Amino acid sequence: MKRGLTFWILIALTQTALASDLPDGNLTPGALDPEVMDSNVKETICKAGHFTWTEGHMPPKSFLEKTEKEQILAYGYPDENIKHYQMDHLIPLSLGGSPTDAKNIWPQPLISKWSARRKDYLEGILHEKVCKGEISLTQAQDEIRSNWITAYEKYIGAADRHP
């Protein structure tokens, strides 16, 4: 009996930890930039040039700072130290995510097995696949929006495969 209870407690703790690595779908369902579509990726997010699409569409720092404080409170994180989070676009700008819609921004933990660094790496892989025509923009957006950790495991493998 005691062994079974221990098992379920460990499962519950694991699920709680995992939940903080993924955005709350009610607070951050993701939002798209209407300028970017499957039909124009070569002219938008995949266009070669001095500046990337992401660099040209970053929201102002003041917007991110304001949103960061609001989102940490909305998420109810017990650790309110903003240095422990990265304001992350659930659907990255490099995949046509909205730069300024709060529904696309969440405070992603930096200190975690599934840290912001890992999601950033996945974003680069998905962007490359979209630009090479290996997957559609819509597929990449859906996969990262529904569960970016599952997408990471699908395209990269276990968390220890990349720092």
Task: Please report, for each region that a protein language model flagged, where it lies by residue.
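Nuclease and nuclease-like effector domains acting on nucleic acids or nucleotide cofactors
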Residues: 2-5, 9-85, 94-163
